[in-house]
């Protein structure tokens, strides 16, 4: 089994300050090492935070990202820092969700990617945002994202 080349990574294994914005955040990638094999990678961020662009109040979401690599994997520490960079970023739920997905697609050029963002209610209305690049490759196992529909107290 070949060892993954991590020589080009700038954040893994070092102390890194949190980026102040998504634009400042550096996403990094590593070779998958499994060319020709379709598999699904899932990242779950159950405590994602951003700010409402109108009120500055915090917004919270449970985000699930699934993708089928085509040669590249996102380096998980850089993804964590990228997602954390939204903490002080003002944007609507839809913008945060789609921007995250498009940034990953730009970095990785995956065979397929989907994101589900399950935003916690503000003003009594939950907003769920879903985006994907197209149909997944045939034959890959795609488990349910596992986030229950918001039911309130009823």
Curated annotation (Swiss-Prot):
Annotated InterPro entries: GTP-CH-I_C/QueF, NADPH_dep_7-cyano-7-deazaG_red, QueF, QueF_type1
Record's subcellular location: Cytoplasm
EC number: 1.7.1.13
Pathway given in the UniProt record: tRNA modification; tRNA-queuosine biosynthesis
Catalytic reaction equation(s): 7-aminomethyl-7-carbaguanine + 2 NADP(+) = 7-cyano-7-deazaguanine + 2 NADPH + 3 H(+)
Coiled coil: none
Binding site for substrate: 74-76, 93-94
Annotated GO MF terms: preQ1 synthase activity
Entries under HAMAP family matching the protein: QueF_type1
Family: Belongs to the GTP cyclohydrolase I family. QueF type 1 subfamily.
Protein name: NADPH-dependent 7-cyano-7-deazaguanine reductase
Annotated organism of origin: Sinorhizobium fredii (strain NBRC 101917 / NGR234)
Gene: queF
């Amino acid at each position: 089994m070949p060892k993954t080349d991590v020589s080009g990574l700038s954040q893994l294994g070092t102390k890194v300050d949190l980026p102040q914005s998504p634009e400042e955040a550096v996403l990094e990638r590593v070779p998958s090492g499994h060319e020709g094999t379709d598999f699904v990678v899932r990242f779950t961020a159950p405590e994602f935070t951003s700010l409402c662009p109108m009120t500055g109040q915090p917004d919270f979401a449970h985000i699930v990202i699934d993708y089928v690599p085509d040669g590249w994997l996102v380096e998980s520490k850089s993804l964590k820092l990228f997602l954390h960079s939204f903490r002080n970023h003002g944007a609507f739920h839809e913008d945060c969700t789609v921007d995250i997905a498009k940034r990953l697609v730009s970095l990785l050029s995956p065979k397929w990617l989907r994101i589900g963002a399950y935003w916690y209610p503000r003003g009594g209305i939950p907003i769920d945002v879903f985006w994907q690049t197209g149909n997944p490759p045939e034959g890959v196992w795609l488990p349910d994202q596992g986030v229950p529909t918001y039911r309130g107290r009823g």
